[in-house]
A protein has these predicted regions:
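Flexible propeptides and autoinhibitory/regulatory segments associated with cysteine proteases
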Residues: 20-216
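Bacterial Sec-dependent N-terminal signal peptides
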Residues: 1-23
Length: 216
């Protein structure tokens, strides 16, 4: 067992040295590499213990677009997107009688949809972190949301013909999301000017209809 651990440790050290090296044009190589274009990007952020890579990756793209179009570096709130996406997924889940997926995952096209419908805010205005929480962890939140939605779906199935669900469950799902992620801001200040999420989206001058998501 000790030999195996030592072997793994040496392997990690070896590969660590390889990947830590600076990549340059080798003096004796016939290949010459030259940077002809550079696309600015915001710093890479951690999604913590959450299934929200789709929000982080898509917003990183739009942050680069803001730098290209407005020459301004703005980090957008991934959790603002996640908060509204969960609500929209919950509504669709009940409307489709539980035949759609209610999970942590998402895709690029969710971001333009949410921004067009709800606007967007800077990351500092909505972190999605509770007091004294330093990193993202959605394990408990998702279990609570999943259990709640299971109860709503069962109630819908138990209704008699002609009966329908009240809208109170929607306030319930919003309450859970607010408890874990925080209430979304209605107004905030950016560079000395007051914005709503919708007016801030307009300020960014990103036309969501200009972007198309393609997958293979």
């Amino acid at each position: 067992m000790k030999k195996q651990i030592l072997s793994i440790g040496l392997s990690l050290a070896f590969f660590g040295q390889i990947f830590a090296q600076t990549v340059t044009n080798h003096p004796e190589s016939s290949y010459k590499f030259e940077q002809i274009a550079n696309h600015d990007a915001t710093p890479v952020l951690s999604q913590g213990m959450s299934g929200t890579c789709w929000s982080f990756s898509a917003l990183s793209f739009f942050e680069s677009e803001i730098m290209r179009l407005k020459k301004e570096q703005i980090v957008l709130s991934e959790m603002y997107i996640v908060r509204h996406a969960y609500y929209e997924k919950a509504v669709k889940y009940i409307r489709m009688d539980g035949k759609t997926n209610f999970g942590e995952g998402g895709a690029f096209h969710d971001i333009p949809y949410i921004i067009k419908r709800y606007g967007i805010v800077p990351a500092g205005e909505y972190t999605g972190l509770r007091p004294n929480e330093e990193s993202i962890n959605h394990s408990e939140m998702f279990n609570v949301l999943n259990g709640f939605m299971g109860g709503v779906l069962k109630t819908a199935h138990d209704l008699r013909r002609g009966e329908s669900l009240s809208d109170s469950w929607k306030a319930g799902i919003s309450g859970i999301l607010d408890a874990y992620l925080g209430a979304v801001p209605k107004n905030f200040t950016h560079n000395g000017k007051s914005y709503t999420p919708q007016s801030f989206a307009e300020y960014l001058k990103l036309n969501m209809d200009d972007y198309v998501s393609i997958t293979s």
